[in-house]
C-alpha cells in the first residue's frame, strides 16, 4: 500500500472522517495525529460533566488504544504538526519527524474565544475546551 491518509485532529470531525473512510475501504492506511491524548469524547459533554461533578474520564468513549483498535488506524497522541509540505505530501511534527501522506485531512476543531474582560469577578470565569 501507499502512503496513508493523515488526519490531523482527534475531535468529532477527525473521528467522523476516520469512520467514514473505514466504511469505504477496510484496508486504506489511516494515521491520526492528535495534540492531546487522542481519546474520543463529545466536547459538549465537558460543561455537563463539570456542572454535575463528573470526572473528565467519565465522558471518554474510548482512549487512543481502544479507538485505534476499533477503527484499525494508527493514532499518534501528544504530537503537533508544525509544517505542511504540500508539494512533498508530508507533515512535519514538532520533533522533526516527517509523515508522508496520500491525502491530508485537517480536522483541527475550535478554540474558545477569550474575551478581554476586566473587573472583580474575572478570576471566577472558567473556560473549558478539552479533557486536560
Task: Label every PLM stretch briefly.
Residues 1-6, 61-132:
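FAD-binding core/adjacent interface of flavoenzyme oxidoreductases
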Residues 2-74:
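Beta1-alpha1 glycine-rich phosphate/pyrophosphate-binding loop at the start
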Amino acid at each position: 500500500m501507499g502512503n496513508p491518509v493523515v488526519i490531523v485532529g482527534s475531535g468529532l470531525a477527525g473521528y467522523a472522517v476516520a469512520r467514514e473512510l473505514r466504511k469505504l475501504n477496510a484496508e486504506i492506511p489511516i494515521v491520526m495525529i492528535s495534540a492531546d491524548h487522542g481519546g474520543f469524547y463529545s466536547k459538549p459533554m465537558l460543561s455537563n460533566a463539570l456542572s454535575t461533578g463528573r470526572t473528565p474520564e467519565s465522558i471518554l468513549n474510548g482512549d487512543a488504544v481502544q479507538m485505534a483498535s476499533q477503527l484499525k488506524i494508527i493514532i499518534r497522541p501528544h504530537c503537533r504538526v508544525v509544517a505542511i509540505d504540500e508539494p512533498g505530501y508530508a507533515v512535519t511534527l514538532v520533533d522533526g519527524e516527517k509523515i508522508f501522506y496520500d491525502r491530508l485531512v485537517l480536522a483541527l476543531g475550535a478554540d474558545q474565544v477569550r474575551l478581554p474582560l476586566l473587573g472583580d469577578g474575572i478570576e471566577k470565569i472558567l473556560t473549558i475546551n478539552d479533557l486536560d
